[in-house]
Amino acid sequence: MAEGTKYHISINVNTAYLAEQSDPAADRYVFAYTITIANTGTVAAQLISRRWIITDAENVTQEVKGLGVVGEQPLLQPGESFEYTSGTAMATPVGTMQGTYQMVAEDGIKFDAEIPPFTLSMPRILH
């Protein structure tokens, strides 16, 4: 079996602008993102840590690293998924996030699950 199939994690992202927590007059734009992490490989894998690159519309980049997600290090059997919601604040109404989750498979192999870039946008900003 190909290694790419054995160790494979799919990531799906949905975003929302949180108007009630944002203050555009103070350049504070708050977004929530809901991520579904699915083990589409053939071996169990545990999410150990995360690394985010957050970039605003002025190309200001922030790197965020930490253990797990929302206080958890989920162990995903093949076919299982884990969903969580978190958030971030930026100084601009549009930005992007991308990154990686470091995973450890049940056989001890470490691998990164890429989080593809996604856009955070205040409604009616992007056309």
Annotate each language-model stretch with its function.
Residues 43-62, 103:
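Short acidic, flexible loop segments centered on an aromatic residue
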Residues 3, 36, 51-53, 100-102:
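Residue-level detector of beta-strand face positions
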Residues 29-34, 98:
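Short, solvent-exposed loop/turn segments enriched in Ser/Thr/Gly
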Residues 89-127:
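Terminal connector regions
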